[in-house]
Amino acid sequence: MILIDGKSLSKDLKERLATQVQEYKHNTAITPKLVAIIVGNDPASKTYVASKEKACAQVGIDSQVITLPEHTTESELLELIDQLNNDSSVHAILVQLPLPAHINKNNVIYSIKPEKDVDGFHPTNVGRLQLRDKKCLESCTPKGIMTMLREYGIKTEGAYAVVVGASNVVGKPVSQLLLNAKATVTTCHRFTTDLKSHTTKADILIVAVGKPNFITADMVKEGAVVIDVGINHVDGKIVGDVDFAAVKDKVAAITPVPGGVGPMTITELLYNTFQCAQELNR
């Protein structure tokens, strides 16, 4: 069994990116810049954004965090985004979710200039993903999953891939990326009947449902590749959506939780920020 080590791979990829960013800055005198916006005082949001700031510094990308009070109105937030859209020194914009209930998430996402939409959530980028447009900014977690498969030499062409979970953030975009990579793809969700009949056929099984140890050994094919996107807190520990202890000896390769997909998400955010800077300054 191969352990797909996202932490180690992420470190290698950041080192590669740091070299590319340094060369880019030397050749263009442009420093890629990410602006992250937090609305309110959600502790998890602050932790996530702090880790993104730290990662930016590691590769030579400028970052700025704008923290707005909980009572910020939607129109005030949209006005700020408009200013950032028109600021040529800002290449990438991230609005940390969740937002307070009085702010419409979609209105906010749709207001970000597609070329600065570092999370890849804007409908333009969703459409570009479908069309395999090279200018597409791919959603960070799905992009990280595909990078893991590629870097570990896991063949997608002709493979049967099953994605459990159909969210806009992970399930749908990773299904599309797998399709683009010439896999045959089935996307399962809460209305799927007889889930096991699908998962036991998967050469590549990707799970993103937010339910601890949801996928058990009897649901996985011998020799499959398993990517566990879940992050769940159980008895003070972080566990995935896959019963790792039971499944690991049955599969060819598997990601751990923590230390699997998570670190790759932030690394791909850095790569997307660099892509934004390059595209905006062509």
Curated annotation (Swiss-Prot):
Pathway the protein contributes to: One-carbon metabolism; tetrahydrofolate interconversion
InterPro entries linked: Aminoacid_DH-like_N_sf, NAD(P)-bd_dom_sf, THF_DH/CycHdrlase, THF_DH/CycHdrlase_cat_dom, THF_DH/CycHdrlase_CS, THF_DH/CycHdrlase_NAD-bd_dom
Keyword GTP-binding attached: no
Pfam families per UniProt: THF_DHG_CYH, THF_DHG_CYH_C
EC number: 1.5.1.5, 3.5.4.9
Binding site residues for NADP(+): G165, A166, S167, I231
Catalysed reactions listed for this entry: (6R)-5,10-methylene-5,6,7,8-tetrahydrofolate + NADP(+) = (6R)-5,10-methenyltetrahydrofolate + NADPH; (6R)-5,10-methenyltetrahydrofolate + H2O = (6R)-10-formyltetrahydrofolate + H(+)
Keyword Phosphoprotein carried by entry: no
GO molecular function: methenyltetrahydrofolate cyclohydrolase activity; methylenetetrahydrofolate dehydrogenase (NADP+) activity
Assembly: Homodimer.
Family per similarity comment: Belongs to the tetrahydrofolate dehydrogenase/cyclohydrolase family.
Role, per record: Catalyzes the oxidation of 5,10-methylenetetrahydrofolate to 5,10-methenyltetrahydrofolate and then the hydrolysis of 5,10-methenyltetrahydrofolate to 10-formyltetrahydrofolate.
Protein name as annotated: Bifunctional protein FolD
Protein's organism: Francisella tularensis subsp. novicida (strain U112)
